[in-house]
Swiss-Prot record:
Mg(2+) 1 binds at residues 297, 301. This is Ketol-acid reductoisomerase, chloroplastic. Keywords: Amino-acid biosynthesis, Branched-chain amino acid biosynthesis, Chloroplast, Magnesium, Metal-binding, NADP, Oxidoreductase, Plastid, Transit peptide. It is an enzyme of class 1 (oxidoreductase). Its main location: plastid. One of its GO terms (cellular component) is chloroplast. Homodimer. Pfam families: KARI_C, KARI_N. The active site is at 208. Belongs to the ketol-acid reductoisomerase family. Residues 90-288 form the KARI N-terminal Rossmann domain.
Amino acid sequence: MAASTTLALSHPKTLAAAAAAAPKAPTAPAAVSFPVSHAACAPLAARRRAVTAMVAAPPAVGAAMPSLDFDTSVFNKEKVSLAGHEEYIVRGGRNLFPLLPEAFKGIKQIGVIGWGSQGPAQAQNLRDSLAEAKSDIVVKIGLRKGSKSFDEARAAGFTEESGTLGDIWETVSGSDLVLLLISDAAQADNYEKIFSHMKPNSILGLSHGFLLGHLQSAGLDFPKNISVIAVCPKGMGPSVRRLYVQGKEINGAGINSSFAVHQDVDGRATDVALGWSVALGSPFTFATTLEQEYKSDIFGERGILLGAVHGIVEALFRRYTEQGMDEEMAYKNTVEGITGIISKTISKKGMLEVYNSLTEEGKKEFNKAYSASFYPCMDILYECYEDVASGSEIRSVVLAGRRFYEKEGLPAFPMGNIDQTRMWKVGEKVRSTRPENDLGPLHPFTAGVYVALMMAQIEVLRKKGHSYSEIINESVIESVDSLNPFMHARGVAFMVDNCSTTARLGSRKWAPRFDYILTQQAFVTVDKDAPINQDLISNFMSDPVHGAIEVCAELRPTVDISVPANADFVRPELRQSS
């Protein structure tokens, strides 16, 4: 992208204007004139041609990738090249903790509102990092009166007596930086009261752009007398804390984070956001916008991060057992392989190494699975992205949160279990006899389906104009380094239900869609012995994303996350061992 189209993070309107002024990418073929999400009335062949045109085009076709530059007076900014696109990052490390008081200049209290997935991790990491920096900034937890989370916060060392635990509204009013980490649905229902309690010139910190999407859908915006920033760890809260603790002796390890400055009233926002990210232990921090973040994040959770991987292992397990495979072997060839050897290989060496590790016969089976699965996966992913971007999925989350309680004479409908079927009971048995450090088998068909899903998600985000750092973190790194290890440890619910309410809802909603489309379209194509789409295989082999992943791999956490079955850093209701 030309230098003249570099975009300022603090001015979203400037971003939109610059994007409009940027050189236009070549026009996509007319076949993509209808979105997949509304293509039910179009013939299947036409839908396939539309998606084929989308994939066959060079990666540059589609929305232009923004060049998100930023200025910092505290930390060192580095330029990296990802697939030919220049981006800027800040490396983390405990050696940077002495810079935190300068980054947080003018802040006396950081209020952490909520104690769900991210709250406990971020509060403890911030407290510990600031203590190491010998800062007198107070990290205070704010909870609603009567919350059961008070006991959990006290157990983590936050107390009323020390002024580090208290009422939500007192905490919001008394904080210079308010980290709003309650559920997205709760944010949507309470934002007006939260805004009214914030001090002028204070800073609102978000770890998800959901609230912006909700406000946009209502034609609203944030108050103009506060700064609005985001630091969004690319992993669940328990991973953020676990890797921070594991990395204490080796200059830090944690979860990569994106950051955004949506509104800056006094020029401090960028350094505060970067300080927040460094204090969380982020190995590297990359820039995004609040809008790009919520679109990629909500979409990613429903895709390969949670929902789609759940859907494909259910579909594959059923396929293998119907073909006569032993149940335990079927579980090993699906869940164990994806969360073990496949994730480990992608994390350290990339997707191509998964393919190159196969025998010649295995590569043929991989190609069949990849060729048959890519377009069906993209079909659902494309629909999901547009549901998020249009606000439909955001509205769905808000309404679902309200159904958790009795209303209008109807009963409450909280989230139900997702690990009570035969497959997941078999998984308990497999894990009970699994040798230590066993990574499961590399099944070529499973690998082909999983990698096809990953590449389809990468392609949708790329065509929608997301930066490579965001694409790779939301489609690859978060999946293999943060989330899959939890499913490997104790099954799908242990992975999904340690995440946010928005992620848990989305995973439950979209997982069946991936299961269905793979069963009805991809596997049927394989069973018919349909020709392999050699263009798809060739595009996979030569895709520039592989080089970008190599660069990101050099910035990965310095340790691998360890998730024991009896982990005590997860949600309280999930702490009992299987």
